[in-house]
Design a protein with these regions (language model features):
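Conserved glycine-rich Rossmann-like NAD(P)H-binding loop of the short-chain dehydrogenase/reductase
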Residues: 30-44
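A glycine-rich helix->loop->beta "capping" turn
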Residues: 52-57, 76-90, 96, 111-114, ...
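The beta1-alpha1 cofactor-binding region of Rossmann-like NAD(H)/NADP(H)-dependent oxidoreductases
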Residues: 43, 62-73, 115
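Catalytic Tyr-X3-Lys loop
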Residues: 94, 107-133, 163
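Canonical Rossmann dinucleotide-binding motif of NAD(H)/NADP(H)-dependent dehydrogenases/reductases
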Residues: 2-34
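Rossmann-fold scaffold of SDR-type NAD(P)-dependent oxidoreductases
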Residues: 11, 85-101, 125, 164
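Amphipathic alpha-helical dimer-interface segment in Rossmann-like NAD(P)H-dependent oxidoreductases
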Residues: 123-156
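Residue(s) in the substrate-gating loop at a strand-loop-helix junction
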Residues: 167
Length: 170
């Protein structure tokens, strides 16, 4: 995958796999990297990347990756300032450690994993990454239409790359 000169978005960029991915994209010559995270730590990551680049390679979008309005605004802002997103790494993830079934050793009663926790984990780790990908594909489609292009043809090359991430904790 060609990274040099591309515009990228990395969610979960404040720590872990997201942070490491953002640094690697910078090392490989991405033109702009939008760092997305709920944590304030994302500003430190941007500062590190910008200090190393001296050209202001990284931008920060602090917010909730499950919020559709936030997601759309991130893509619209990037398109207006840097062009269409060409690389997406939706690496934001959460865990809510708990056994799926827990047996109380004194009472013998079993309790199951709380539904609200399960829904939250699925929303962040599965649904949100898919919708970030759909947002990118929609933006590429709009850009193609604006340029008078119709159906994609293989000789046009890649329009974008989406890299889904998983880990033991997510």
């Amino acid at each position: 995958m060609k990274i040099e000169g591309k515009v990228a978005v990395v969610t979960g960029a404040a720590s872990g796999i997201g942070r490491a991915t953002a640094k690697e994209l910078a090392n490989r010559g991405a033109r702009h990297i939008a760092l997305v995270d709920l944590s304030d730590e994302v500003h430190k990551v941007a500062q590190e990347l910008n200090d190393a680049d001296s050209g202001g390679i990284a931008g920060v979008f602090q917010g909730d990756t499950t919020d559709p309005e936030f997601r759309h605004q991130v893509f619209e802002t990037i398109r207006a300032e840097h062009g269409v997103v060409q690389i997406l790494v939706p690496a934001a993830g959460v865990t809510r450690d708990s056994l799926s079934v827990r047996l109380d050793k004194e009472t013998g009663k079993a309790s199951i994993y709380a539904l609200d926790k399960f829904r939250f984990v699925i929303e962040v780790n599965l649904i949100a990454p898919i919708y970030w990908a759909l947002e990118m594909v929609a933006q590429i489609s709009e850009d193609r239409f604006a340029r008078g292009l119709k159906r994609w043809k293989a000789d046009e090359g890649l329009q974008g790359s989406i890299i889904f991430i998983g880990s033991v904790s997510s």
